[in-house]
């Protein structure tokens, strides 16, 4: 139907006839001449219709926004002074000779040039219109290019693209599963996979050696800006390769990706940081190194302090008292500090103590704070010395269980960095390593695997697990972090049955439960499982970062809302009673 894309028409086509197809982006009538900006996936070109061709001109008068058109015309240079340097086709225009109205269109729910005035709900309900916007097209094109680049790298390095099942069994760890009832096995359910974790391990046991897959995963969890109920992973697994090999390989993959797509040279090698150091300095295991703010431990300075808010956590083995030094922060108003206090409350903090530093040379007299009267001179001097605070600075404090302090001050650090324009404009990748094997849940009073229960501990003998404090065990896990976002997480896996059973026991999974839930894995481990490991990257997050989008919804063609709903199709929806009966299901509405 066409000879050229709209965005490809150029001065090399001067005096040639072209046939174009696309949407009417804008129509203007100037002095009896009609101008239509015709748009397709590749861009936009100006088409001119003059009254010398009455039939074509009459059709052009009927055109409105988003009409689908086919135009045959001749390319000519724009008159002097009317060129548009901001448009790739801005030196030329097409004189319309024939016009076909392929399809009219209702008035769009929002103007494509004014989408910011439309709420996200409207954009998602009319996603097929929203995706016509150039920035959305560019993001999806970037996603396709990123995906292609990653595939090429892995293909070149001997990886096999192998699909794993979408219908599998429910997993006991992690987020809630999406369940699929089985018609042929009434009362039984499949689960949509949260990841291909066990299947990719089984592929290594089957001798596939190097596997990858760009795969959809599903988690029924609370949503945030970087979460969706269905999302895409780049999943990788290798045999006979330790953590050093996997990290080196995937670093090279990311360096090539950024160089090819963004013309950005990432560092070689990526820096590394232990989990304990990351939590101590940044309150997060995915620190944004572009922000020059750090946490400082001050619990040891609270020995003689009777202020229970500080003294209690300082004496608690699971507690922490930390300071966050903010250069120039003394200028924050009371209202701003109150807002930050409310902000950290979302993370469980009961308050936000602070000291404004007016003149540290004057000691207490040069400080301003409601908590000064509760602190000893030694504590105050130690805080000033350790934070290296100067005149005009501010020091925030967190005192609680270590998890609360880390979550609250870690989030506050990031917010302050953005609010005070401290974020450096650069790419700062990082490997976080030496993760704890387990984390203790205060509410449940039990251990959970920090990554997943198939991660190998940093010991070779299962007997060593019983001799050590489980909370002190270190795993062979590693996360790739970029600008405060976890791009990927991986580990060396357990490849011996006795080690896997020992880890299950530490997690409170007895032999019968392990056999019922993971019998197929335990059996496979008895048939010559090779040492293996891997990593999974969140493709949506990666594209979001590389395109500068505000959320992963902006880099997905058809995302769900914050309530896990599809406004376009009105999913999820009730189903016919006959379908439920066929599945042996009955709906019980939750009581109000």
Swiss-Prot record:
Its EC number is 6.1.1.23. ATP binds at residues 219-221, 228, 486, 538-541. GO terms for biological process: aspartyl-tRNA aminoacylation. CDD domains: AspRS_core, EcAspRS_like_N. The record marks 30, 81 as: Important for tRNA non-discrimination. InterPro entries: Aa-tRNA-synt_II, aa-tRNA-synth_II, aa-tRNA-synth_II/BPL/LPL, Asp-tRNA-ligase_1, Asp-tRNA-ligase_1_N, Asp/Asn-tRNA-synth_IIb, AspRS_core, GAD-like_sf. It is found in: Cytoplasm. GO terms for molecular function: aspartate-tRNA ligase activity; aspartate-tRNA(Asn) ligase activity; ATP binding; nucleic acid binding. Disulfide bonds: none annotated. It catalyses: tRNA(Asx) + L-aspartate + ATP = L-aspartyl-tRNA(Asx) + AMP + diphosphate. PROSITE patterns: AA_TRNA_LIGASE_II. It is an enzyme of class 6 (ligase). GO terms for cellular component: cytoplasm. Residues 197-200 are annotated as: Aspartate. L-aspartate binds at residues 173, 219, 451, 493. Keywords: Aminoacyl-tRNA synthetase, ATP-binding, Cytoplasm, Ligase, Nucleotide-binding, Protein biosynthesis. Homodimer. Belongs to the class-II aminoacyl-tRNA synthetase family. Type 1 subfamily. Aspartyl-tRNA synthetase with relaxed tRNA specificity since it is able to aspartylate not only its cognate tRNA(Asp) but also tRNA(Asn). Reaction proceeds in two steps: L-aspartate is first activated by ATP to form Asp-AMP and then transferred to the acceptor end of tRNA(Asp/Asn). NCBIfam families: aspS_bact, PRK00476.1. This is Aspartate--tRNA(Asp/Asn) ligase. It comes from Alkalilimnicola ehrlichii (strain ATCC BAA-1101 / DSM 17681 / MLHE-1).
